Amino acid sequence: MHLLVLGGTGFLSGEVVRAALSSGHRVTAVTRGRRPEPGADAPAVRSVRADRDDVAALTEAFAPVLADDAPDAVVDCCGYTVDGARAAADALAGVPRYVYVSSISAYRDWPPGPVPDESAPTFGSEASPEEYGPMKAQSERVLEDAFGNRLLSARAGLIVGPGDRTLRLTSWLHRIATADRVVVPATGDVPVAFVDVRDLAGWLVVAAGADWSGPVNATGPVGMTTYGGMLAACRDAVVASGAPAAELVPVPPARLLEAGVEPWTDLPFWLPDDVAATAWQVGTARARELGLPSRPIEDTVRDTWRWLATAGLEQPPVPDRVDPRAFA
Ligand SMILES: NC(=O)c1ccc[n+]([C@@H]2O[C@H](COP(=O)([O-])OP(=O)(O)OC[C@H]3O[C@@H](n4cnc5c(N)ncnc54)[C@H](OP(=O)(O)O)[C@@H]3O)[C@@H](O)[C@H]2O)c1
């Protein structure tokens, strides 16, 4: 199969390129050329420079690809504007299959959710497409109008794994590896779910060659781990590498909120109880039926920790609000 990847040098898109190559597919990657990371520039990859949000640029860049070796499928990993969806719908209309990486943020009532399955309502066209969730919902509709049942919209959940430069999972690893004591929310038994970037990328490549259509919640199964399980995996990964690991200091959510601790940003992945009770409840029965794998969180965390050792990722100082001395 000849796969056209929109993106190719980023977190998910780089992994999609790697997965496609390792399955023996030919890859053309479209980027603006801002990230000189391996992937799209590997010799087996045809690298095309264009801003995918610009229909004229995308059409012009795509013309020689179409003339030489028409792609069998698109995997769209950089849909960040509705104009970008329109540009792809126009420039790539003749490609037989389109897999769009959307987000569970497309759901109108998430958070707090729950999202039992893909029939839950998404944002309507009245919602501002300047915002991420409405933009994803609107982009899905634009692409569905163009590609119909040739479109699969993979509504990704939280993507984690090696190469993740968002300061979420890596922030926990960094804190645990560099402090003596680390404040954590005392919500250890709350179920949480993530999707490993390698599981998602490999599956997107399979999806590009399948005849699946419509939306699918592309994340880990409800209850795949808990908040405490994720933190324990971080601690275990640090300890297994021979580094000292911090003592975890659980603080009840009410005390955290009283102290002005910002959910999610100060303590990554932490949501207040009323939101957490439903926000992590995203039904993934269809993804499981379609074979989206879900490796153990311990494997994801261990590999992320190994990657972090050489990633040169700068971590901001831990906010004073979550200094353990404030909760003594
Ligand atoms: N990270 C998550 O937890 C999460 C959760 C749900 C959904 N998603 C979705 O997953 C997808 C991938 O996310 P990611 O963070 O892993 O992104 P990514 O793969 O790092 O995407 C960035 C890639 O796309 C290229 N790119 C970005 N804008 C472009 C443009 N206008 N024209 C051409 N190329 C462009 C970048 O190269 P250049 O900069 O060189 O152009 C880079 O290769 C996104 O659609 C995101 O909305 C992510």
PLM feature segments, named:
Residues 206-275, 303-305, 312-328:
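Mid/C-terminal beta-alpha module of Rossmann-like enzyme folds, strongest
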Residues 103-130, 145:
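Active-site "gating" loop of Rossmann-like NAD(P)-dependent oxidoreductase/epimerase domains
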Residues 3-23:
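N-terminal Rossmann NAD(P)H-binding glycine-rich loop of SDR-like oxidoreductase domains
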Residues 6, 161, 185-190, 216-225, ...:
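Glycine-rich Rossmann NAD(P)(H)-binding loop
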Residues 48-71, 83-86:
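Conserved Rossmann-fold cofactor-binding substructure of NAD(P)-dependent oxidoreductases
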Residues 167-172, 185-217, 228, 299:
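Substrate-positioning beta->alpha
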Residues 30-34, 52:
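N-terminal Rossmann-fold cofactor-binding loop
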Residues 102, 140-163:
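Conserved beta-loop-beta element that borders a ligand/cofactor-binding pocket
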